């Protein structure tokens, strides 16, 4: 099996960046979910509240994070950490320390997205702070992440997407691209749902341990280029019907993972990976 896609999401819930290789760290791929949008109460803001966030594209240069939108000029944000007081921001039930970006970024967001983005600001994860991953599925180990929903890596497979799309078409619906699921790592795999039986995935330089199925939310219904919802409730409705995790409630697609060997290594598109099966 080979890795066919690597995607980094520097800003939570904005567009991702497809890369050919990336450094791999305990907190995720390099720069993944380092930034996040928050409201006036310092609570995280995502496509769940603002689907139009999907219309903001992201680039990384050697010294800047660049945000672009069709209606406004791009804005560049220095990769150097901003000066200023730390804020306490929330992601689900976690409280994290973060550095606020400039007011100019907030003004840019409102100009790009209009009234719904009023009061929204951009913050950067403070690397002096550690956000622990829930320990329920870590088998006694430890892991941490930045502003991801819960885990530093999300792994999906081409075989599972093919199976989902076959089911969508059979139900009279339109197939969806992989970006609906916002994975970090996509593995080429002929058979559907094989990832649900993997314990680890590794190459010579790193090992990822698959911890739990990823329960999906309504962001999967949002077109990741236009910010619109083409077909109400899909692909969630079809995923629920497929019931790929009969022992769990909800719709699931992909596996959450943590790094268990190879901190600081490099992961590459095209490299062959091996898997070990989960114990029955």
Regions found by a protein language model. Give the residues of each.
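Metal-cofactor-dependent catalytic cores
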Residues: 1-280
């Amino acid at each position: 099996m080979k890795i066919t896609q690597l995607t980094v999401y520097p800003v939570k819930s904005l567009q991702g960046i497809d890369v050919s290789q990336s450094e791999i760290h305990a907190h995720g791929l390099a720069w993944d979910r380092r930034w996040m949008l928050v409201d006036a109460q310092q609570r995280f803001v995502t496509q769940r509240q603002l689907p139009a966030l999907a219309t903001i594209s992201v680039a990384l240069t050697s010294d800047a994070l660049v945000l672009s939108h069709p209606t406004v000029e791009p804005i560049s944000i220095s990769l150097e950490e901003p000066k200023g007081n730390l804020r306490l921001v929330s992601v689900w039930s976690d409280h994290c320390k973060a550095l606020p970006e400039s007011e100019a970024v907030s003004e840019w967001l409102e100009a790009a997205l209009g009234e719904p983005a009023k009061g929204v600001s951009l913050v950067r994860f403070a690397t002096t702070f550690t956000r622990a991953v829930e320990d329920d599925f870590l088998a006694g180990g430890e892991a941490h992440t930045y502003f991801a929903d819960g885990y530093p890596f999300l792994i999906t497979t081409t075989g599972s997407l093919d199976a989902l799309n076959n089911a969508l078409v059979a139900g009279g619906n339109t197939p969806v691209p992989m970006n609906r699921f916002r994975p970090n790592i996509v593995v080429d795999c002929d058979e559907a749902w094989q990832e649900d039986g993997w314990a680890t995935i590794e190459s010579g330089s790193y090992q990822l341990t698959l911890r739990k199925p990823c329960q999906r939310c309504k962001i999967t219904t949002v077109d990741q280029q236009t910010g619109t919802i083409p077909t109400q409730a899909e692909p969630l409705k079809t995923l629920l019907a497929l019931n790929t995790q009969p022992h769990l409630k909800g719709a699931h697609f992909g596996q959450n993972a943590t790094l268990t060997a190879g901190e600081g290594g490099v992961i590459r598109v095209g490299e062959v990976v091996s898997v070990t099966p989960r114990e029955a």
